[in-house]
């Protein structure tokens, strides 16, 4: 089972949702970087479960114990390993799922690939729980990028049919800072009330909803990336699609850009009052030819509805070879989008830091 991303930096995740612990090892980080562990804790709390009625009732402190690579708060250059101990597992809720395949989950393909030995409790290694150590790694990367002047932020763009505003062309650090401090990061102040109603209605109906997260990175210098196979878009897409439940990734105007004419989609260059090169729009999301052009790097990530729902569904029993009905027990999110915002930020920061090492 592969669990390593390897380019200029290396990421190896480990653990299962209902195992003793989950964690990550980050290789090839620069030495001598001061890390603020309070900042790490703030991002961990943004993703943590059990904070409100719109997420799973599972409660995990998600405190990271750093085993190596950090001394007196400074990176040593050795692989940095962080571990998070699981404490609130209800494994009995999964007793039927060794043989009854959950629709929309990894159960059946994992059963085939790993010959039935995979851990299905809470999704095992396929679980969204494994994004907790990714957020830890992402915050380390976020702090390193911040020292280079690069700032990353994100917001909930939509939940179900309820939509927030998109980031403005001239998005600034003040807006990103404000969003990072909100429990429900939206640009429009009143939109999350409608999103909340959508989530709670789905839960009441024993169902779930999906949505979109929009993420930007400011002050990324021009010239980061490569054409074709090593484009920044290729690397960021690979990381974003590593987040469980992600089904679509686009950059700039993405899936809407095909409705434009070339004269509308082109981002025209100009010199500003300081002699810096800018573009008058950012339809391409700060990347052209696979390489950054100095404008904000922006992407939109789409999450499918949570597959674990309490509504009765049709499936198969792989032991009896029968068609059966399944009602999933346990504690599950009716929507993961609001908790995934910081995960998308983490992948953006890791991808940019990785490509800046080229």
Which role fits each region the language model picked out?
Residues 10-15, 118-130, 222-226, 282-288, ...:
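A short glycine/serine-rich beta->alpha loop
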């Amino acid at each position: 089972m592969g669990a390593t991303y390897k380019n200029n930096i290396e990421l190896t995740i480990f653990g299962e949702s209902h195992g003793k612990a989950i964690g990550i090892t980050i290789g090839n980080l620069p030495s001598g970087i001061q890390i603020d562990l309070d900042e790490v804790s703030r991002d961990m709390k943004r993703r943590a479960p059990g904070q409100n009625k719109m997420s799973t009732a599972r409660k995990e402190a998600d405190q990271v114990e750093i085993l190596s690579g950090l001394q007196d708060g400074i990176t040593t250059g050795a692989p940095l390993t962080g571990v998070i101990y699981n404490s609130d597992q209800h494994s009995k809720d999964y007793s039927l799922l060794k043989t009854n395949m959950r629709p929309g989950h990894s159960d059946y393909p994992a059963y085939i690939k790993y010959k039935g030995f995979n851990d299905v409790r809470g999704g095992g290694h396929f679980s969204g729980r494994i994004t907790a150590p990714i957020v830890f790694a992402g915050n380390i990367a976020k702090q390193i990028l911040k020292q280079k002047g690069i700032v990353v932020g994100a917001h909930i763009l939509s939940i179900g049919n309820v939509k927030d505003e998109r980031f403005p062309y001239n998005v600034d650090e003040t807006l990103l800072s404000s969003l990072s401090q909100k429990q429900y990061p939206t640009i429009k102040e009143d939109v999350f009330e409608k999103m909340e109603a959508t989530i709670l209605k789905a839960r009441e109906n024993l169902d779930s909803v999906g949505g979109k997260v929009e993420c930007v990175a400011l002050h990324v210098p021009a010239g980061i990336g490569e054409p074709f196979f090593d484009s920044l878009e290729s690397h960021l897409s690979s990381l974003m699609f590593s987040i469980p439940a992600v089904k679509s990734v686009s950059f700039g105007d993405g899936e809407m850009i095909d409705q434009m004419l070339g004269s509308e989609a082109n981002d025209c260059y100009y010199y500003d009052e300081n002699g810096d090169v800018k573009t008058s729009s950012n339809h391409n999301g700060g990347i052209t030819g696979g390489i950054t052009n100095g404008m904000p790097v922006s992407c939109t990530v789409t999450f499918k509805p949570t597959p674990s729902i309490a509504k009765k569904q049709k499936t198969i029993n792989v032991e009896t070879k029968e068609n059966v009905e399944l009602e999933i027990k346990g504690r599950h999110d009716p929507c993961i989008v609001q908790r995934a915002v910081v995960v998308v930020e983490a992948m953006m920061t890791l991808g940019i830091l990785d490509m800046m090492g080229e």
